[in-house]
């Protein structure tokens, strides 16, 4: 097995032939045509006109969007770029695009202008202090922490997604520390980058 040689455990061979398994999450419907146009717009540094729906606005709504990166965050893909409707850099979920995307010419909004994308933050995670010393030691070992802390470098624009994947709630502590497990130690340092901070 590869993990014996590298220390990294990935499931790349067919699972039916192995002693391992993985979750099969439902896939979100993503239009190939829309993704092709978004990738073309990224390479050409162009704007694209798209129809987009969201939970806050479930009706088809046209947007002019200047994409710069496609990101897989957990179980979904989104595209990062400048939204002219919102007048700022945003993440749009790929499965929420509707209709046909059309290129609209050069974009004045470059990836270098996306402060949250260009900024690197360090997330400092630690075992929930409400856990017993033995429980904290388990997590310290799981995550190979040094001095009971795990430091993770990430783009500020991706910090929320990383925290969600690590099941770290930044707003309140879960009622049971076994459910919370990890806490964000340096919340004040990265507060400006957190959703609904």
Where are these regions (language model features)?
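Core beta-strand-centered patch of the WYL/Sm-like small regulatory domain
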Residues: 17-146
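Bulky hydrophobic/aromatic content
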Residues: 1-53, 165, 169-177, 181-186, ...
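Polybasic (Lys/Arg-rich)
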Residues: 117-197
């Amino acid at each position: 097995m590869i993990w014996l040689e590298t220390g990294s455990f990935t499931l790349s061979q067919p699972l039916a032939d192995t002693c391992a398994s993985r979750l099969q999450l439902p896939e979100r419907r993503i239009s190939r045509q829309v993704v092709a146009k978004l990738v073309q717009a990224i390479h050409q540094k162009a704007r694209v006109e798209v129809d987009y729906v969201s939970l806050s606005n479930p009706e088809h709504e046209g947007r002019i969007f200047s994409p710069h990166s496609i990101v897989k965050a957990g179980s979904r893909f989104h595209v990062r770029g400048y939204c002219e409707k919102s007048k700022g850099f945003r993440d749009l979920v790929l499965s929420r695009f509707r209709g046909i995307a059309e290129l609209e010419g050069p974009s004045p909004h470059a990836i270098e202008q996306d402060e949250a994308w260009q900024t690197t933050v360090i997330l400092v995670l630690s075992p929930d202090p409400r856990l017993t010393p033995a429980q904290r030691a388990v997590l310290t070992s799981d995550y190979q922490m040094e001095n009971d802390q795990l430091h993770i470098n990430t783009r500020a624009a991706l910090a929320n997604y990383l925290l969600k994947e690590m099941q770290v709630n930044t707003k309140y502590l879960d009622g049971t520390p076994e459910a919370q497990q990890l806490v964000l130690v340096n919340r004040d340092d990265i507060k400006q980058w957190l959703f609904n901070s």
